């Protein structure tokens, strides 16, 4: 990639997104596909556009994303986190606005591990009195 890019890494659950932004027309490319093709649900698109809409930069930047790991929801959250960090790299004055919306903080919730003797992380086997 040649040019003046701003970079941000985003993480959510087990997904990791590497986000590159540069001034352009508002095109978002995720893993070589347009964002509306990559994310099958509308909620994924809504999530990744949130920091851009908040800062009024929807048509200002071309965004290129490499994301791997996790599912669709986790990847969308990782992309949002990466876009937020890249916007802060571009203009540090946006940080307070993005922080108030809660986009800067990494959501640390992870899947709880399954325990031995239980069906799932917390679900026990059904108890029978008789």
Swiss-Prot record:
Q: Extract the SUPFAM superfamilies matched here.
A: Ribosomal protein S5 domain 2-like
Keywords assigned = Ribonucleoprotein, Ribosomal protein
GO process terms (BP): translation
What are this entry's molecular-function GO terms?
A: RNA binding; structural constituent of ribosome
Q: Which PROSITE patterns match?
A: RIBOSOMAL_S9
Q: What is this protein called?
A: Small ribosomal subunit protein uS9
Asked if the record carries the keyword Lipoprotein, the reply is: no
For this protein's source organism, the top of the classification is:
Bacteria, Pseudomonadati, Pseudomonadota, Betaproteobacteria, Burkholderiales
Using the record for this protein, list the coiled-coil segments as residue ranges, or answer none.
none
Q: Which residues form the signal peptide?
A: none
Cellular component GO terms, alphabetically?
Answer: cytosolic small ribosomal subunit
The family line of this record is: Belongs to the universal ribosomal protein uS9 family.
Residues annotated as transmembrane: none
